[in-house]
Amino acid sequence: MTQMAAARNGTVTEEMERVAEREGVDPAFVRQQVADGQAVIPANVGHDSLDPMIIGREFATKVNANIGNSEETSDIEGELEKLHTAVHYGADTVMDLSTGRNLDEIRSANVTHSPVPVGTVPIYEAVKRASDPSEITHELLLDVIEKQAKQGVDYMTIHAGVRMEHLPLTDGRKTGIVSRGGSILAKWIEENGMENPLYTKFEAICEIFREYDVTFSLGDGLRPGCLADAGDDAQFAELDTLGELTRTAWKHDVQVMVEGPGHVPMDQVAEQVERQQEVCDGAPFYVLGPLVTDVAPGYDHITSAIGATEAGRAGAAMLCYVTPKEHLGLPEKSDVRDGLAAYRIAAHAADVANGREGARDWDDALSEARYAFDWREQFDLALDPDRAREYHDQTLPGDNYKEARFCSMCGVEFCSMRIDQDARSDGDMESIEADADDRTPLEDSSAAAVNRPPVGTHDGADIPGPDADMPADTEGSADD
């Protein structure tokens, strides 16, 4: 029985109980949100290492990290190291977007070791097995999807909304079709002269998903790839189809979230979130950024985190991170770290802006430690403690500076907080308590787990590092 079926039957599952604990809400509320399709708990029945989490606009904003290999870099150990990094730095879910060798082995290793939900895009494996997009058959697609479901994948991006009738709508674009899945299916449609097989076989996919409790992540294959293409007829025609498919999946008791753009001018972000919520009857919105400018390759974790903050404030339930390597190359471990930092900031800022219960407690606790010159507490409370400590110690490395009432930015003479404290102690201004006993007690905070330190809610100790004994890369595997 799927989480949605159980919820509709009035049953609070173990997964719902765990989610309620992590979010600080009543399990009955979780059940109702899942029953109504307003939230999803991606939890394949075969993912034994999973710690359940929830995605929905009434819950803390979540962050996904994309990992995966390519033909140029196909290394199982490296992918597990990326998984370890993603989990350590706060990814709520990960997507394995591998397109190189050893797809089965990498996917299986990720599911085996990941405490967070694992997503995939099955059309990638279908292309690898067929050698060319036009050679993909309906049977091959269903076979790949069922195999990945059996492996324990929690959610899959299914680009079923790319219809034959939509393709002419992309003709006037500046950047055409920028989704890998969308472009693959567009080529299939053009060369075979038939409707998208993921659309025509959608109900069969629903049956597979219902058996293994896989969540749909309905892909936006026609998402805009630049500001000029945002909000065009192609994007919104596909969105209308995604609304139709959402309701079809719900009839099968299958959970659904809907993917969104992309590249969107800042002033259109909230409008696009609101339109998705209306068209898709409140199904959780999962957005890639969006990037709010196209001029900063190398810094697109920043251009997109700006849009992601606005999307989260407007109601997007999960933000798909973008790394500094976006548009330039395959991310490495350090890029995963930087992308997650940008997106954890975006998600937290959105939760604070939306008045999510307890979300600002973390900010208050760090501010109190800062005013008290409690450097060690500041580092411990930081979103990335290692980075905060590293930057401080570059100029003031000695332990004695951990007790100092200044840092190297202002020095002793010009530290504003030191001057303020001295003025309050010597004059008529009321003093501000800076003792540890008077600070915000985070252990009593009502905030969801993702809005309290440490950022990585799982330590990742069970995820093998690069030196672990893993299967060797194999030339000529079935996935080549």
UniProtKB/Swiss-Prot annotation:
It catalyses: 5-amino-1-(5-phospho-beta-D-ribosyl)imidazole + S-adenosyl-L-methionine = 4-amino-2-methyl-5-(phosphooxymethyl)pyrimidine + CO + 5'-deoxyadenosine + formate + L-methionine + 3 H(+). Zn(2+) binds at H263, H327. GO terms for biological process: thiamine biosynthetic process; thiamine diphosphate biosynthetic process. Binds 1 [4Fe-4S] cluster per subunit. The cluster is coordinated with 3 cysteines and an exchangeable S-adenosyl-L-methionine. Its EC number is 4.1.99.17. Pathway: Cofactor biosynthesis; thiamine diphosphate biosynthesis. [4Fe-4S] cluster binds at C407, C410, C415. Residues 470-480 have a biased composition (Acidic residues). Signal peptide: none annotated. Residues 426-480 are annotated as: Disordered. Substrate binds at N66, M95, Y124, H159, S179, R180, G181, D220, G221, L222, R223, E259, Y286. Its cofactor is [4Fe-4S] cluster. Keywords: 4Fe-4S, Iron, Iron-sulfur, Lyase, Metal-binding, S-adenosyl-L-methionine, Thiamine biosynthesis, Zinc. Belongs to the ThiC family. Catalyzes the synthesis of the hydroxymethylpyrimidine phosphate (HMP-P) moiety of thiamine from aminoimidazole ribotide (AIR) in a radical S-adenosyl-L-methionine (SAM)-dependent reaction. This is Phosphomethylpyrimidine synthase. It comes from Haloarcula marismortui (strain ATCC 43049 / DSM 3752 / JCM 8966 / VKM B-1809) (Halobacterium marismortui). The gene is thiC.
